[in-house]
Amino acid sequence: MQELLEEEIKLQQIQTLPMKMMQFVSLINPADAIRAIDRIMDKRKDAISIHNSSFMTGLYYELSGLYQTENCLTILAALDILKNLGYEICNKDYYTGFSNVCEMTGLMGRWQKLQSYPDLICDTGHNVDGFKSIRKQLKYIHEKLHQELHIVFGMVSDKDISSVLELLPKDATYYFTKASVKRAMPEDELMKMALEAGLKGTSYPTVVDAVRAAKENCPPKDFIFVGGSSFIVADLLANRDTLNLH
């Protein structure tokens, strides 16, 4: 049954969704996708606006980030298939589920906003594919929103660090650090590799130290990104009170 469901999802993405969701499918293009992210108000999370001809508009996806628009396609296709298989899923379930993902699942650290003025966002991107998606978002923030980038970054030693460093924006200020796990790459070694890759920045022994430095150096109008290894994000979230992040 699982294999059948996965195969049906692929078919739905290729065939059914383009007919039912022409507006939403077009959002796969990053330039279009960003238009679907509604900045509701300060200190409130961004939300992706979803339009589907099979039910009323006004459905908002709590998880933000450009790559989430593609994830929505898979979710909506899977829900259509589950309904066809006999599962009872009403319109209210769509609204409740999409707008309360984090509260219902406990999911954290996926393009999660922790502060305004300056904006501080965290996300995990511990491999090349992950950072390809993050790079698109950072590029938009820098080039279209005209915000300078301050990036707190760390990785574990057993990943393809060189390839990830090549994807990072060259015009950002970096705060290289390490997570509180044995696998974490030492911050000085990471900084050496980063400098060789054309990046600029300073190393810090802990995530807390790095984030504090970024907050001190970043003007209110600019942008702080914290990411790399999932452990970096975990250390950040574990120290939200210490860093006065809400």
Short names for language-model regions:
Residues 9, 31, 71, 123, ...:
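Residue-level signal for inorganic ion chemistry
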Residues 1-58:
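Extended acidic/charged loop-beta regions that coordinate divalent cations
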Residues 25-27, 152, 175, 202:
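Hydrophobic/aromatic beta-strand patches that form the interior of the parallel beta-sheet core
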Residues 1-3, 150-152, 172-180:
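Short internal beta-strands
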Residues 126-127, 157-158, 180-182, 230-232:
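Short glycine-rich anion-binding loops that position phosphate/pyrophosphate groups of nucleotides
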Residues 53-173:
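Nucleotide phosphate-binding/pyrophosphate-handling subdomain across enzymes
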Residues 229-246:
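Glycine/aspartate-rich loop-and-adjacent alpha/beta segment that forms the canonical ThDP
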Residues 16, 44-45, 119-121, 128, ...:
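C-terminal helical cap/extension that packs against the catalytic core
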